C-alpha cells in the first residue's frame, strides 16, 4: 500500500525529465537550423569585414568598390561559411587583419614610398608641355581631389615658365543623374589661373595607356617630345614609363597630395593604408603593363633614376 504512491511519484518524475522519442528529432532539427543560421550570419559578417579592409586600402576593382560590392562580399561569405571552406575564409580574414596591423603600426608605407616614387630633377631648360593626368569624377561635375592636385601642380609649372603649355587627359563617368566629363571642371579651374594659360585636352581615355597614346597623338605630330608628367606619387613610376614607351622624353613629377597618402605619408592609419594599397595595386599593374609591352624598355640606368 505504501509502495504504490512512491512508484507513481517516481514515474511522474521520470516523465518530466526525459523527452519522448518523438520530441528528439524535432529539437535536434531546431538546433541544427540555429547552428546553420549562426554560421551563415558569421560568414556574412566575415565577408563584409573583408570588404571593409580591402576598401580601406583601395584594392577593390570596379563595381566591387561600390554599393553592390558590400552585398556581394556578404553573400559570398555567407555561402562559404555554410560550406566546407569556412575555415579558409576565417584564415583570410585573420591574415588581412594582420596586414592592417603591421601597415598601420610600422613605417612600412614610408619605406615603400621612398623606394617606389619616381621624382626626376626638373631640367633647367624646362619642357615643351606638362601633362596632368586625370583621376576620378564626382556627380556634381567636379574632378576628385587627386585629379585636382595633378591639375594644380601642372598649372603651377606653366605659370612658373617651366612649360609652354598644359595638357590634361579627359575622362567621363556615368552617374544616375547623367554623364560627367572632366573637361567641365578642368576648364573652370584653368580659368581661375587667368586666361593666358595655353591649355589643350586629349580625347577620352580609360587607362594610363590611353592617356599616353592620346597625348602622343596630340603632341608628337607638332614636334613636342620633351614633357613633364604630373601623377600621384605612387603612380609616377608606371605612368612616366608608359609615356616614354610611346616616344616621349619624360620628366616625372609627383603631385603634392591634399588627400591621404602622398610621397611622404604621415604616421596615421589613413595615409599608411592608402600608400600600401597603392603600392600593391601599382606592383600588379606594372607587371601587367610590362607583360604587354606598354612600358619603356630603356637602359637600366634610366630605370634606376633617383627616387
Describe the residue ranges of each PLM region:
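A structural signal for short, hydrophobic/glycine-enriched beta-strand patches
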Residues: 68, 102-273
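Short, low-complexity intrinsically disordered segments enriched in A/P/G/S/L with frequent Arg
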Residues: 6-10, 16-18
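Short, Lys/Arg-rich N-terminal segment immediately upstream of the first membrane anchor
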Residues: 24-38, 82-83
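Extracytoplasmic/luminal low-complexity segments enriched in Pro/Gly and acidic/polar residues
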Residues: 298-307
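Transmembrane alpha-helices and immediately adjacent membrane-cytoplasm interface residues
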Residues: 77-113
Amino acid at each position: 500500500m505504501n509502495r504504490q504512491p512512491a512508484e507513481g511519484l517516481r514515474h511522474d518524475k521520470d516523465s518530466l525529465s526525459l523527452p519522448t522519442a518523438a520530441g528528439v528529432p524535432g529539437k535536434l532539427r531546431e538546433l541544427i537550423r540555429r547552428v546553420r543560421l549562426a554560421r551563415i550570419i558569421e560568414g556574412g559578417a566575415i565577408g563584409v569585414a573583408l570588404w571593409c579592409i580591402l576598401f580601406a586600402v583601395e584594392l577593390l576593382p570596379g563595381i566591387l568598390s561600390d554599393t553592390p560590392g558590400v552585398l556581394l562580399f556578404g553573400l559570398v561569405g555567407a555561402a562559404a561559411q555554410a560550406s566546407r571552406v569556412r575555415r579558409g575564409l576565417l584564415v583570410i580574414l585573420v591574415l588581412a587583419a594582420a596586414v592592417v596591423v603591421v601597415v598601420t603600426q610600422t613605417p612600412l608605407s614610408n619605406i615603400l614610398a621612398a623606394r617606389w616614387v619616381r621624382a626626376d630633377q626638373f631640367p633647367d631648360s624646362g619642357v615643351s608641355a606638362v601633362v596632368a593626368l586625370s583621376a576620378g569624377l564626382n556627380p556634381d561635375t567636379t574632378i576628385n581631389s587627386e585629379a585636382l592636385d595633378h591639375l594644380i601642380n601642372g598649372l603651377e609649372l606653366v605659370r612658373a615658365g617651366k612649360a609652354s603649355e598644359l595638357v590634361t587627359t579627359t575622362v567621363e563617368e556615368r552617374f544616375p543623374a547623367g554623364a560627367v566629363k572632366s573637361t567641365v571642371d578642368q576648364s573652370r579651374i584653368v580659368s581661375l589661373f587667368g586666361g593666358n594659360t595655353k591649355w589643350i585636352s586629349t580625347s577620352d581615355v580609360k587607362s594610363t595607356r590611353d592617356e599616353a597614346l592620346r597625348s602622343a597623338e596630340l603632341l608628337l605630330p607638332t614636334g613636342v617630345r620633351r614633357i613633364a608628367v604630373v601623377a600621384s606619387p605612387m603612380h609616377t613610376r608606371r605612368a612616366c614609363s608608359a609615356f616614354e614607351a610611346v616616344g616621349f622624353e619624360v620628366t616625372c613629377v609627383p603631385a603634392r597630395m591634399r588627400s591621404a597618402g602622398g610621397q611622404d605619408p604621415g604616421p596615421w592609419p589613413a595615409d599608411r593604408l592608402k600608400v600600401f594599397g597603392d603600392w600593391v595595386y601599382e606592383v600588379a599593374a606594372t607587371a601587367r603593363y610590362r607583360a604587354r609591352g606598354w612600358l619603356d624598355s630603356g637602359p637600366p640606368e634610366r630605370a634606376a633614376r633617383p627616387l
